[in-house]
Amino acid sequence: MNTATSQPRRLTILGSTGSIGTNTLDVIRQMGGRDRFDIMALTGHGNVALLAEQALVTGARLAVTSDENQYIALKDLLSGSGIDVAAGSSGLQEAACLEADWVMAAIVGTAGLQPTLTAAARGADIALANKECLVSAGELFIETVRKGGGKIIPVDSEHSAIFQCLDENHRDTLERIVLTASGGPFRTFTRQQMADVSVQTARAHPNWSMGLKVSIGSASMFNKALEMIEAKHLFDLTPDQIEVIVHPQSIIHSMVGYSDGSVLAQLGVPDMRTAIGYALSYPKRAALDVDRLDFTKLARLDFEAPDLDRFPAIRLARTALERGGLQGAVLNAAEECAFEAFVEEKIGFLAMADVVEDVMDHLSGLAPATVIADVFAADAQARRRAQEVILNQGRTR
């Protein structure tokens, strides 16, 4: 018997308490749980009760809260369990350094960049749900993974679909990729209607169950903007090879077009566990308890071009792709600030794009990054400028 194949696979989940993290743990449970997987580390933020519960159920070796104020609470919850506890950015780094073979990168925002880079540098396979690694760090992140010797397996449903449909053996015949977008809750709204929408309305996605940040990003289509930039780096595409189409039913997750006119698409019910299961079992496929697609019940599949007047995020992504350099990092940082301002009711829904465009134009002359410190510097500059713009927006509301 080959004992190497019988050893549990070592996993770390960066961001286990969010939507992606909880779905990942469900997939792990379905695929055999502790009999097949050794959980090295779980990380979360403020929900330490859930984090502690997850750590106890999975037998994780380390539990980390990125909120240093929650360290004592987490330590108390895990007292006597034998599970190590850490906190803050140093705790995230400790989790990333543990010898996991496979790391789910699901921390939302720029906070997930450094620990994911650390895991990639030591050679782990990265199941990538964090958008900022590619949007902000781009080629630097790709190069880190290459040097480490691991793989990137996308977890976004759109990029997972492209990953599954893209034939690398015939890469020279690739013409385009088509990212599908649901259009979110405001697909049929006018700009006037969108001007006064609330946070609660914006977070109510018609198809997917997601966290607040991703739900608002779907409503504004900034999620799709980030995915366009991700796709460029992940699949080594030119800007004109990247298309976006609105598909309200979210059944076709994305498509790849080839030079002979063929288009390959990946279909399925909207359930993140499918993409997570593929990332965890790649290059095989897992047997998962998810709903199956019933074609007899599909009344129709609709497609429409995105309205760039109502959803300028797509236009801003194209600008970032054309400018290159650090524009992705700038767009991402400005969007995070604009999102926070909208959630805190400092600016309106449509003003988020105004903030991002101002910051991108203001910092359009930044030199390309040569080291990761350049990315963090651009991120800081963009956030400072965004806060200035948000302050002025608030005064004029």
Swiss-Prot record:
Gene3D superfamilies: 1.10.1740.10, NAD(P)-binding Rossmann-like Domain
Positions with a binding annotation for 1-deoxy-D-xylulose 5-phosphate: K131, S157, E158, S182, H205, S218, N223, K224, E227
Domain of life where this protein originates: Bacteria
The organism's taxonomic lineage, starting at the top: Bacteria, Pseudomonadati, Pseudomonadota, Alphaproteobacteria, Hyphomicrobiales
Protein family per UniProt: Belongs to the DXR family.
UniProt keyword NADP present: yes
Metabolic or biological pathway, per its Swiss-Prot or TrEMBL entry: Isoprenoid biosynthesis; isopentenyl diphosphate biosynthesis via DXP pathway; isopentenyl diphosphate from 1-deoxy-D-xylulose 5-phosphate: step 1/6
Role summary: Catalyzes the NADPH-dependent rearrangement and reduction of 1-deoxy-D-xylulose-5-phosphate (DXP) to 2-C-methyl-D-erythritol 4-phosphate (MEP).
Binding-site positions, Mn(2+): D156, E158, E227
Residues bound to NADPH: T17, G18, S19, I20, N47, N130, E132, G211
GO molecular function annotations of the record: 1-deoxy-D-xylulose-5-phosphate reductoisomerase activity; manganese ion binding; NADPH binding
InterPro entries assigned to the protein according to its UniProt record, in alphabetical order: DXP_reductoisomerase, DXP_reductoisomerase_C, DXP_reductoisomerase_N, DXPR_C, DXPR_C_sf, NAD(P)-bd_dom_sf
Keyword NADP in record: yes
GO annotation (BP), single: isopentenyl diphosphate biosynthetic process, methylerythritol 4-phosphate pathway involved in terpenoid biosynthetic process
Keywords: Isoprene biosynthesis, Manganese, Metal-binding, NADP, Oxidoreductase
Pfam families attached to this UniProt entry: DXP_redisom_C, DXP_reductoisom, DXPR_C
Protein name per Swiss-Prot or TrEMBL: 1-deoxy-D-xylulose 5-phosphate reductoisomerase
Co-factor(s): Mg(2+); Mn(2+)
